[in-house]
Amino acid sequence: MVPPTVVRPRQGAASPSFPVPSYPIERVRLGNGLRVLFAPDRTAPVVAVSVHYDVGFRSEPQGRTGFAHLFEHLMFQGSANVGKAEHPKHVQAAGGIFNGSTHPDHTDYYELLPSGALELALFLEADRMRSPKITQQNLENQIAVVQEEIRVNVLNRPYGGFPWISLPPVAFDTFPNAHNGYGDFTELAAASLDDAEDFFDKFYAPGNAVLTVTGDFDPAEALTFVERYFGDIPARAVPAPGSFAEPVRSQERRERITDRLAPRAALAVGYRVPDPIGDLTGFLAYCLLADVLSDGDASRLERRLVQHDRSVTGVRASLGTFGSPFEQRDPLLFTLEARQSEDATADGVLAAVDEELGRLAHDGLVVGELERVQARVVSSLLREADDALGRAMSIAVHELRRGRPELVNELPAELAAVTADEVTAAAASLLDQGRSVLELEAGAAPTA
């Protein structure tokens, strides 16, 4: 384990000092544009390998809703030198685990294995980066698989897709920000082989990806493997990142949906926040505000809505509607989600939220409140970075979004530097904009 340093807050911030790791990070860029990050740590005999492609469901073409998710599935259907279903077999036979996931702004694939299997993981990832098996049979099979996922996880589950699928079309107007990234049955069924090949050619170029290796390995040996397997993958043009910008509304927008399976009404509220890339310092105040409002029994909305008013059975504040707050581009939402009690109304809950935000903006934080929240958030980041896989995913996202993989070491200091005034100003800003409100009406009989 790398010896920790001690981070002390700037003047006006909370008083605790946080020990944070200083993980070494080495950066290499191959001739084909592939960015490679090495973060060795000999603590445990495991390695994590991840490949992050700079494309998520906000970049998929209009008329092909869910295509980024579908293509993630296609990447597991074999490649030039790896048969169908052999990728999982190879990883599991080596004692490892694997997965992939599609996010608003990236798609990731990873393996976590014993350190002796590093070369295997790099070979597998390089082979599918070079030549995945995009065939009509694989396409049709995976369309059916994704459609079944939608049935199970959204259509036939209480609160399925709430609010990550159902709130964005209330909060945003453009297709990239508002559409359902999980997938639409009709548009998935219309996907063609040409669509898949075009998507691969455009977004799955080595120059549009970040390869990360963390854990128990020798960087010199790893670089030899990387150059052997990835070095001769042909370079292709990389799409320029488009803007998803939308203006912040001045008026509230409210919509209502019915969930035939939900036993209780629910409420989701979205507010706009500063650009998480262009204004990271400003954005971090909202990260702490989310925990001030809803993390733990002592948080403000937990005390007010759950314990005092008993208007909701649970409340959660978060940044974004899907994934880590640090992985997304602008715009994203500060989201409140609550499951209402039987006799509660959405207007009553919203009025109480406004009161608590106003009280926080006017009266400020109480003694020790910011320190408690900072300690929780920093502890969560430290736990995430403590294992090889969590570290790999964090490092890759920071490189992809900001070109700063070292943020895995620096974020605790950045959070410790946020002041109480910045958090209260963030609370005030939520009251000064037109929020987006989604009411979910219960369609099922209430449970006891």
What are these regions (language model features)?
Residues 3-45:
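N- or domain-start disorder-to-order transition segments that initiate the globular core
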Residues 147-166, 245-264, 307-319, 363-409, ...:
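Short acidic/His-enriched helical or mixed secondary-structure segments at domain edges of catalytic enzymes
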Residues 33, 51, 69, 91, ...:
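Buried hydrophobic packing residues in well-ordered domains
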Residues 2-13, 173, 181, 206, ...:
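An aromatic/glycine/proline-enriched structural segment found at the starts
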Residues 2-18, 210-212, 360, 368-448:
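C-terminal regions of mature proteins
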Residues 2-8, 13, 53, 79-80, ...:
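Acidic/histidine-enriched segments that form metal/cofactor-coordinating
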Residues 268-272, 293-340:
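A structural supersecondary motif
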Residues 33, 41-91, 280-293, 302:
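Active/ligand-binding-proximal structured segments within catalytic/core domains
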